[in-house]
């Protein structure tokens, strides 16, 4: 093994607000002691309180997302509940693609599966 995943990093215009949103979706909590000042911006992470999921970092960037993500997060969850929290529906589930594509409040796409892992 040459390496392992240490965490996931998301670019964000409002990194604290986006971190709080993802906490509400995933049941994560803000990681205390990880906030840093970086040119006046908050740089921090969120973590799974059960220590089962990866830590997610939020990196301040000056520009909005303009193209489709080259990489995305897949989660198991309740699509309606995530939409009610402020996600946007990008693509419906179909028999060929049994997951939904949603976007977070800053437009970052992610997939939601509602049942068993569809990729195994």
Indicate residue ranges for each PLM-predicted region.
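Short, small/polar residue-rich loop motifs at catalytic or cofactor-binding pockets
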Residues: 95-97
């Amino acid at each position: 093994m040459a390496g392992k995943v240490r965490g996931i990093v998301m670019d964000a215009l409002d990194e604290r607000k986006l971190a709080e949103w993802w906490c509400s979706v995933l049941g994560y909590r803000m990681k205390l002691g990880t906030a840093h000042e970086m040119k006046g911006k908050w740089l921090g992470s969120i973590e799974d309180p059960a220590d089962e999921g990866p830590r997610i970092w939020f990196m301040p960037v000056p520009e909005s997302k303009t193209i489709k993500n080259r990489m995305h997060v897949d989660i198991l969850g309740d699509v309606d509940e995530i939409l009610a929290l402020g996600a946007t529906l990008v693509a419906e589930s179909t028999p060929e693609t049994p997951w939904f594509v949603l976007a977070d409040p800053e437009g970052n796409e992610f997939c939601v599966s509602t049942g068993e892992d569809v990729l195994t």
